[in-house]
UniProtKB/Swiss-Prot annotation:
Oxidoreductase is among the record's keywords: yes
Keywords (A to Z) from UniProt: 4Fe-4S, Iron, Iron-sulfur, Isoprene biosynthesis, Metal-binding, Oxidoreductase
EC number: 1.17.7.3
Cofactor note: Binds 1 [4Fe-4S] cluster.
GN (gene name): ispG
Alphabetized GO MF terms: 4 iron, 4 sulfur cluster binding; 4-hydroxy-3-methylbut-2-en-1-yl diphosphate synthase activity (ferredoxin); 4-hydroxy-3-methylbut-2-enyl-diphosphate synthase activity (flavodoxin); iron ion binding
Protein name in UniProt: 4-hydroxy-3-methylbut-2-en-1-yl diphosphate synthase (flavodoxin)
Function: Converts 2C-methyl-D-erythritol 2,4-cyclodiphosphate (ME-2,4cPP) into 1-hydroxy-2-methyl-2-(E)-butenyl 4-diphosphate.
Similarity section: Belongs to the IspG family.
Length: 414
């Protein structure tokens, strides 16, 4: 089933709604952005600071590793440290292998978390699997916590894979190995969800994911999951990689699914550059959703790519400067003004498309190209208002942007 979205003709896949702390996931709720820390959870201050960085960048949920007793003991202290920093973002505990033990022995950890993530592929093997899975579900029920059942092709339950392979071998036309793997992922997720409900977890407390690192496989898996269940779905290309490769791969996969209305929360699993900001994955997730018209997080800065008419570096510097300025100002603007995230700002490099593109934005500036008159007309809501000249064009244009925000958007009460 599907529901209409406010974004053009896009139709959202109809799912249940799951509450995670103060955040709603699924049904008609906006697609939620989430992220994950890469700190040692035992480092309370370091983890809290990175969670705060991710939350301030716009992450609406942040996942942290809980892999041993020291990490489990640290979780409540991380929560307290965040509240002292005035950061109230829901924390998701990431459990593998020993989650049943850690949660049983450290109930304060379970209480401090807003959601539990468990992997059916490593919750336990053989006769231990079901009791250990049941133990985590029981803890989730007692603490009223939702659960993401997260299947991953790198840790797929071997018993499920073997069963699906046996079934495939009996078909008149057996499927290829990739199709078998995809089916095993879907079966593992759905059977685990059914078992969680059997153990007492409400259907409105379950989110599913089934991650792979191939774009085409991810699209196929989630199409299948969406067709076979109404649980909210967490999208993400696992191990997407670094830099532009990771961004392009994640965007290629998620954009297709989101356009089909599939996906209720997303995470971009980028490998950060050495000494790079972990928050880049949050920015990329926001930009995917905003570019597709699904969410609005920050004013959009439109800029042309430049050509032989724009040989001056000033155009590039101004476009970059305005992009950074808008993003830096957004935390303040968001607190003060309603709707400012919908603003568009155009920074264009020459007379060919500059004036026309600038007129379509809320605010636009058309810089002179090579050989053009050294003047930069500014357009506000489609009307030319002023022409800037000289060495202070960037500073003057930022002041115009500030004035537009202050005069066009409604100031919030209080």
């Amino acid at each position: 089933m599907a529901t209409n979205s406010s974004s053009g003709s896009l139709v959202r896949h109809k799912t249940r709604q799951v509450r995670v702390g103060r955040i709603s996931i699924g049904s008609n709720a906006p697609v939620v952005v989430q992220s994950m820390t890469n700190t040692d959870t035992v480092d309370v201050l370091g983890t809290a600071m990175q969670v705060a960085e991710l939350a301030r960048a716009g992450s609406e949920l942040v996942r942290i590793t809980v892999n041993n007793e020291a990490a489990a003991k640290a979780v409540p202290h991380i929560r307290d440290r965040l509240l002292a920093l005035n950061v109230d973002v829901p924390l998701v505990g990431d459990f593998h292998y020993n989650g049943h033990k850690l949660l049983s022995e450290h109930p304060a950890c379970a209480e401090a978390l807003a959601k539990l993530r468990i992997n059916p592929g490593n919750v336990g093997a053989g006769a231990k699997r079901d009791p250990q899975f049941a133990a985590i579900v029981d803890i989730a029920c007692r603490h009223d916590k939702p659960v993401r059942i997260g299947v991953n092709w790198g840790s797929l339950d071997p018993s499920v894979l073997a069963r699906v392979m046996d079934q495939n071998a009996k078909l008149a036309q057996p499927r290829d190995a990739n199709a078998v793997m995809r089916e095993a992922l879907v079966v593992s997720a759905l059977e685990s969800a059914a078992k969680a409900e059997e153990y007492g977890l409400g259907g409105d407390r379950i989110i599913l994911s089934a991650k792979v690192s191939s774009v085409q496989d991810l699209i196929a898996v989630y199409r299948d999951l969406a067709a076979r269940c109404d649980y909210p779905l967490h999208l993400g290309l696992t191990e997407a990689g670094m830099g532009s490769k990771g961004i392009v791969a994640s965007t290629a996969a998620l954009a297709v699914l989101l356009q089909e209305g599939i996906g209720d929360t997303i995470r971009i699993s980028l490998t950060p550059e050495p000494n790079g900001s972990r928050a880049q994955e949050v920015v990329v997730a926001q930009e995917i959703l905003q570019t597709m018209g699904l969410r609005a997080f920050t004013p959009m800065v439109i800029a042309c790519p430049g050509c032989g008419r724009t040989t001056s570096t000033f155009f590039q510097e101004l476009a970059s400067g305005i992009q950074s300025y808008v993003r830096d100002q957004m935390p303040v603007w968001r607190e003060q003004y309603d709707g400012v995230e919908n603003m568009t700002v155009a920074v264009m490099g020459c007379v060919v498309n500059g004036p026309g593109e600038s007129k379509h934005a809320n605010i636009g500036i058309s810089l002179p190209g090579t050989g053009e008159t050294p003047a930069a007309p500014v357009f506000v809501d489609g009307e030319k208002t002023v022409t800037l000249r000289g060495d202070n064009i960037g500073t003057e244009f930022k002041a115009i942007v500030d004035d537009y925000v202050a005069t066009r958007y409604v100031k919030k009460a209080g």
